[in-house]
Structures are given as structure tokens and as C-alpha cells.
């Protein structure tokens, strides 16, 4: 049985990574695909754990070689998912989660129409502003640019199957887990997973 591909996107500062990490800790059946990026690591980020950090030239080389499942220019830096991180795992029956932006999500849905997509929204603009400022990693100019970009990203929430409002962290994680559980109970998935039982019941 082929695995399920999950897409999770959100504007910067909405708490996407924290929710994803907490959800994966509860649901070990899903593997997180580590994205490639051409941007420099932020304080505390480690290569191959948070991202695969490569130069812009290396990223362009991977694009030309057709190595990416999806890629996009995000906040002036390239981000992408390697084919090798997704296709073999799905074919082997493993569920894979992509933590990407809306541009990459649109590309993925074109290639995998049955992918399950989730968009995370902050509870308010003020909360988004406060969360981004707490990071303390960007100048005021960069912060203003990121807030403007976040508002642009939120316009695309209607392209996703599910929407989570991250007002209370534990609730948001529980809602994410519920989405994963529900997707596994879809008729098509259950029909494949329990084909023998269904045949026995209906014969």
C-alpha cells in the first residue's frame, strides 16, 4: 500500500515547526522530509536536522539536475524538497510530511492530487507580530518585510484541505493528530489496508 503524503504550510511565526515536531513525537508513523535551503543557518539550527544547508549555486545545480520534488524562492532564498526524500518512501508504504510554503504545496498537489494539506494560521495579526519579534533574529527592516510576506502567504489558506488556528498550542497539536488519524480512515485507504477482511465479509 502506498504511503500518504502530508503537506503542512503556514506563514512565518505561526508556530508551524513547533506543531509539526510535537505531532511527529505523538505519531511516529510519519517521517518528516528535511528540506534543502540556500539561506544561512539561524542560531541553533543544525545541518541535516533542521535543513540541508547548501549554497545558491549548489541549489541551482540541483534544480538543473531535476533533483527536486518541489522548490520555490521564499523570502529571497531557495527552499526545496529532494525527490529522494519523498518518492521512495511513499512507494515503500511510508507516510511522509512536507513542511513547506504555499508555492511548494501547489506544486506538490499537482503531482500528488491525493496529498493531505494543512494550513496553520495565527489567532491574530498581533499574535503573529509578537511571535516573530520574540525570535530576535531579524532587523526591523527585515521584520517588516517578513510580516508583509506573512500576510501575503495567508491569502492562500483556501487552497488547503484543513485549517488549524494556533491559539492554544496543545489544541493545535491535537487537531493536527486528528487530521492524520482521519486521513487513514478514508475509504480508499481502509479498502487497501483491509482488503482481505473486506473480501471475506462481502463474499
Swiss-Prot record:
GO molecular function terms attached to this record: ATP binding; guanylate kinase activity
Keywords: ATP-binding, Cytoplasm, Kinase, Nucleotide-binding, Transferase
Residue ranges of domain Guanylate kinase-like in the record: 3-181
Chief location: cytoplasm
EC number: 2.7.4.8
InterPro entries named in the record: GK/Ca_channel_bsu, Guanylate_kin-like_dom, Guanylate_kinase, Guanylate_kinase_CS, P-loop_NTPase
Protein location: Cytoplasm
Transmembrane segments: none
Any Pfam family: Guanylate_kin
SMART domains given in the database record: GuKc (SM00072)
Record-listed ATP binding positions: 10-17
Catalysed reactions, as listed in the record: GMP + ATP = GDP + ADP
Entry's Gene Ontology cellular component terms: cytosol
Family: Belongs to the guanylate kinase family.
Matching NCBIfam families: guanyl_kin (TIGR03263)
Its biological purpose: Essential for recycling GMP and indirectly, cGMP.
Protein name: Guanylate kinase
Amino acid at each position: 500500500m502506498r504511503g500518504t503524503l502530508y503537506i503542512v504550510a503556514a506563514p512565518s511565526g505561526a508556530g508551524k515547526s513547533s506543531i509539526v515536531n510535537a505531532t511527529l513525537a505523538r505519531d511516529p508513523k510519519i517521517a518528516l522530509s528535511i528540506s534543502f535551503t540556500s539561506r544561512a543557518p539561524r542560531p541553533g539550527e543544525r545541518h541535516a536536522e533542521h535543513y540541508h544547508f547548501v549554497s545558491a549555486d549548489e541549489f541551482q545545480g540541483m534544480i538543473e539536475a531535476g533533483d527536486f520534488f518541489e522548490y520555490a524562492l521564499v523570502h529571497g532564498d531557495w527552499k526545496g524538497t529532494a525527490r529522494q526524500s519523498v518518492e521512495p518512501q511513499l512507494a515503500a508504504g511510508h507516510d511522509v510530511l512536507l513542511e513547506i510554503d504555499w508555492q511548494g504545496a501547489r506544486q506538490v498537489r499537482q503531482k500528488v492530487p491525493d496529498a493531505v494539506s494543512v494550513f496553520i494560521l495565527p489567532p491574530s495579526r498581533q499574535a503573529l507580530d509578537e511571535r516573530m519579534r520574540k525570535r530576535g533574529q531579524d532587523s526591523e527592516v527585515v521584520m517588516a518585510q517578513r510580516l508583509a510576506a506573512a500576510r501575503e502567504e495567508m491569502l492562500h489558506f483556501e487552497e488547503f484541505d484543513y485549517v488549524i488556528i494556533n491559539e492554544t498550542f496543545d489544541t493545535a497539536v491535537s487537531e493536527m493528530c486528528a487530521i492524520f488519524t482521519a486521513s487513514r480512515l478514508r475509504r480508499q485507504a481502509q479498502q487497501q489496508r483491509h482488503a482481505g477482511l473486506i473480501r471475506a465479509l462481502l463474499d
